[in-house]
Amino acid sequence: MRSMRSGRDNNICFLGFLSFALISLPSLSLALTNPDDVAAINSLFLALESPLLPGWVASGGDPCGESWQGVLCNASQVETIILISANLGGELGVGLNMFTSLKAMDFSNNHIGGSIPSTLPVSLQNLFLSGNNFTGTIPESLSSLKSLSVMSLNNNLLSGKIPDVFQDLGLMINIDLSSNNLSGPLPPSMQNLSTLTSLLLQNNHLSGELDVLQDLPLKDLNVENNLFNGPIPEKLLSIPNFIKGGNLFNVTIAPSPSPETPPSPTSPKRPFFGPPSPNASAGHGQAHVRSPPSDHHPSRPTPQGKEDSFTSKRIIWISILGAFSFVVLALVCLLCGRKCLRKREDSEQLSKPHLTSEYGRAREGSRSNASMLPPSNTFNKDKEARPKERVGGASKLHGGAERSVGSESKQESHEIDMNGNAMDLMHPSSIPPIKRVIAKATEPAEASLKRTTSKSHGPLTAVKHFTVASLQQHTNSFSHENLIGTGMLGSVYRAELPGGKLFAVRKLDKKSPNHEEEGKFLELVNNIDRIRHANIVQLVGFCSEHSQRLLIHEYCRNGTLHDLLHIDDRLKIELSWNVRVRIALEAAKALEYLHEICDPPSIHRNFKSANILLDDDIRVHVSDCGLAPLISSGAVSQLSGQLLAAYGYGAPEFEYGIYTMKCDVYSFGVVMLELLTGRKSYDKKRDRGEQFLVRWAIPQLHDIDALAKMVDPSLKGDYPAKSLSHFADVISRCVQSEPEYRPLMSEVVQDLSDMIQREHRRNDSNGDNQYTGRR
């Protein structure tokens, strides 16, 4: 009896232990994060002075399983930490090397100080520390980061020399060290950066020559406001975007090196008006080949001293006579040119009333804010120039209506040839037979803009100029209640005018590019104002005063497509299948206009469902168009790429710092997937294999049964099977991993238009047209 009771007690104990183990098992299995990564992120949290970040703790925790803010994982390993403008302080600490596979780290625009740690993770590919308070020198341990491709350390307090650490960093694509206190020459190992395309060094105290850069595949090089000297290597002058002002360069251009050619004994000296550089070099490669110190050094004595002296004097006199002749010739040309210009202006006066009579008057009449523009000739010239620019940027829409410049009227019947002339827009009887005036209409808009903005800082655009005081009044002093959203370029507020008219006011962050330079900001305003399409958010006005830079756009009451699909269940019900296809088509037309019709072409760079605004009729208005110059500069560019990639919109080539029109196409394909499935592009609440929408969806797009299961459940199966299949085919082409296999946006527009036409024909017999209105 006693043995039976003891056996029963043992069974009870065993069952109790088993129950405890089963209860504990889920909590153990949920601890997904690698322990080394947990220790590293705990150490980072303490070094940052324990900021208020959702999920973050000083000890333990599960960053991957609990989705800590700004932390992205791959399986159990932390791969990305993005904490931009999070008001962080403290330092980065010394525990970063404990991360096992951290690839991207972005702490831009915070208040982090101290020195940059020498214990950075060797797995790093992207490092963004711009806009902080880092001091000290750039660590030499960078040489161990052999996977590093992008590094932004700009806008800090770094000092000392750039370390000679680039020997093994052959994957580097972008480097931004601008706006620090760096000094000394460029390190020789920089010549090993065989994949470097962007190097920004402006606003430092760097010195020496640029010869170590001459064989690099650079597309962007900014060295302005430094102490660089010597001749500029000839190869650097072919860089598409080379900014070099504010240095001590000689007028002489250093020739390309040719080691096999010996120096000529009678080669001329440096020009007398430029001081000889102590380090004048034409060399490159591993050993810096310097020019032999023959007669390039005037202080060196030679046997033919008298002949050299005579030759020098002769060269000086020839130079003086040549300069004098050039001045005389320039004066003659100037006088003749002014006479010709007067004659030309006289002839143009005959045609100006006709050129502005129909096209220009529509623009003037539609603008109630003409009095806000600067008086005098600036406005008069602009009135005549704008219609000419418009011809270059006019669009051929696929069944869509193009907005008139600042008016509610539509020009649905006009198809304007971009290579044609202004005569096609007017009644023949109103055109004087002056061919010279018509030919001027084909002048590229950007050329005219650059020429004019270089002479004046006044606004050339006809959009309204608001004051800061008026915008404060209309936004309740930019109150939190009026805040619509916050992005990488600043915050957006709702403004309500006394008559009830609503606008969206974008307050640009003071750290964003072009913020300080008013001329560049006004040029940006002009460029945005020229982007006019029925499916693109229209610029209404701007503000540039008291160091504030603001852009005012039209307001769309139904918010964003992202909110409609993922937040507002009430309105989501109204998104029938046909309406979703129409939304995709209108968004595609906006990108087609930017890529293939707008002059000059434009890349969006930030295309996502949150930037697709919807008006009262659920019509598409794409926002952030024309802001690519802000996004493509410095740390903001890397931030844009990181965010798009982190949230599932980024094309695979983002990893290499590449952004082209085909990246916009990829992002558009992701938005189409959102319309198809009703899912977010990245949803950390879903199972790990379903968090990134593209990865989850691609294998199923060509499986009929799987495709039907992917469709947004809120559609309740109400969609044509063929239309669904065609929609999936377009998505599949847009999200191809190789950019060359993605279609042009005009092809996408054609495919979606054909889909709608087929459905129109199918529904005509039923009198049902669901592609219009809110249904």
UniProtKB/Swiss-Prot annotation:
Signal peptide boundaries: 1-31
The residue intervals holding the LRR repeats read 101-122, 123-146, 147-169, 171-193, 195-217, 218-238
Outcome of mutating R386K? In strain: cv. Landsberg erecta
Q: What is the effect of changing T442N?
A: In strain: cv. Landsberg erecta
Q: How does it sit in the membrane?
A: Single-pass membrane protein
| Domain comment as written in the entry | The protein kinase domain is predicted to be catalytically inactive.
- What protein name does the entry list? Protein STRUBBELIG-RECEPTOR FAMILY 1
Recorded source organism is Arabidopsis thaliana
